[in-house]
Amino acid sequence: MQISKAALLASLAALVYAQPVTLFKRETNADKWRSQSIYQIVTDRFARTDGDTSASCNTEDRLYCGGSFQGIIKKLDYIKDMGFTAIWISPVVENIPDNTAYGYAYHGYWMKNIYKINENFGTADDLKSLAQELHDRDMLLMVDIVTNHYGSDGSGDSIDYSEYTPFNDQKYFHNYCLISNYDDQAQVQSCWEGDSSVALPDLRTEDSDVASVFNSWVKDFVGNYSIDGLRIDSAKHVDQGFFPDFVSASGVYSVGEVFQGDPAYTCPYQNYIPGVSNYPLYYPTTRFFKTTDSSSSELTQMISSVASSCSDPTLLTNFVENHDNERFASMTSDQSLISNAIAFVLLGDGIPVIYYGQEQGLSGKSDPNNREALWLSGYNKESDYYKLIAKANAARNAAVYQDSSYATSQLSVIFSNDHVIATKRGSVVSVFNNLGSSGSSDVTISNTGYSSGEDLVEVLTCSTVSGSSDLQVSIQGGQPQIFVPAKYASDICS
């Protein structure tokens, strides 16, 4: 019997909904994260303690390259000067030490002991110092964590569970079976990620003894290291009922990785975790901005779908690249398309996430090539993308400061044609396009909410225009445009 894609997705969503629903109580910490702009870091690849900017790092080798907590500390001003208010760092706990078929666990996702810090990145005191240095700059720390699995060099049928801490017995894990059908939610949650070369033993998070240990651990982990937020890896592979108590025990905003592009599947996870990675928006965003041949209709429809399907889109995290997906600059070399994609992430709904190296135009494709050593770029503050991000973040930060409702307001599309999208959030009107570097267009945008004669500033060029309900916009060279009331721009374009 043939089953339609729509019916299949509906059944998957039903499985998510079928769990006993415990709505997450959104605490003030989650409210605080709505106004943040996040810079994502793979610790091993961002900055070295010794400050060396020529140390080799061949991504294909998959070795530790020397990035550290102290290295991050030394480059915090590089991040803050782009306007970021928070960082998200890769997992910090001890991982398996083996040189596997896929190299070492420099990325942090192959756990061995949740109570120890990975010494390749520094000491526990170094991590505490990183949190303190961030807080001294009025910035927040988000740490990536794994609750779904541990790691093992080799096949899953020969695991020595006694090497793990604290889950040192097979009884804490699901029986070995590799996921063969990602459309089967029971398999997705109970079978194992990984393969016969590197197994990822899958924890029984539905068991109260496993959940109790994790809840106690996360409370201490967050408290000991002054962590402000958590990113939860592989969330769709974990029993949903595990999350409400776990998130409450942590006491901080958490965002779950639900690697699925259908909002009917992804959005219900907000019943269990306050934030979710916005994969439903990721796919149409990259498809629209990577080529001049795409129409905006898929993207505008998904903006509407996410707004209606997710209980709180302002707590989703938006992105166009990360450590699991190829860098956007590998999809196109057109600088205006890349600039539009970056600006769209920063000025859209939810919480923006920029992956380290986007500001330097790094262009690695999929893992491991999208995990380059940033120090080889020289941390150039004069790169076009660095300056674009700084101005777009400045516009967003000014809007958050000037308008107490900005962070909770939802994006609306106020104009679109095949190649141009104009959005409004609060008093910020942004115009994006996929015309390409040689493209130009004149458009009239209605329903801006601006008053006749109101002074506006386009922050990327610092040009002043006179506002009205109908805004005349001339797109040149395919560049994005961000309009704000003049009072927002006093520090941006002074």
From Swiss-Prot:
Binding-site list for Ca(2+) 1: N148, D202, H237
Enzyme Commission number(s) of this protein: 3.2.1.1
Necessary cofactors: Ca(2+)
Positions contributing to substrate binding: W110, H149, R231, K236, H237, G261, D324, R371
One family name in Pfam for this protein: A_amylase_dom_C
SUPFAM superfamilies: (Trans)glycosidases, Glycosyl hydrolase domain
Principal subcellular localisation of the protein: secreted
Single GO MF annotation: alpha-amylase activity
CDD domains registered for this protein in UniProt: AmyAc_euk_AmyA (cd11319)
Disulfide bonds: C57-C65, C177-C191, C267-C310, C462-C493
Keywords for this protein: Calcium, Carbohydrate metabolism, Disulfide bond, Glycoprotein, Glycosidase, Hydrolase, Metal-binding, Secreted, Signal
Protein residues bound to Ca(2+) 2: D233, E257
Source organism superkingdom: Eukaryota
Gene Ontology, cellular component aspect: extracellular region
Subcellular location: Secreted
Signal peptide: 1-26
Record-annotated active site: D233, E257
Annotated site (Transition state stabilizer): D324
Family the entry assigns: Belongs to the glycosyl hydrolase 13 family.
Full protein name: Alpha-amylase
Source organism per UniProt: Saccharomycopsis fibuligera
Gene symbol of the encoding locus: ALP1
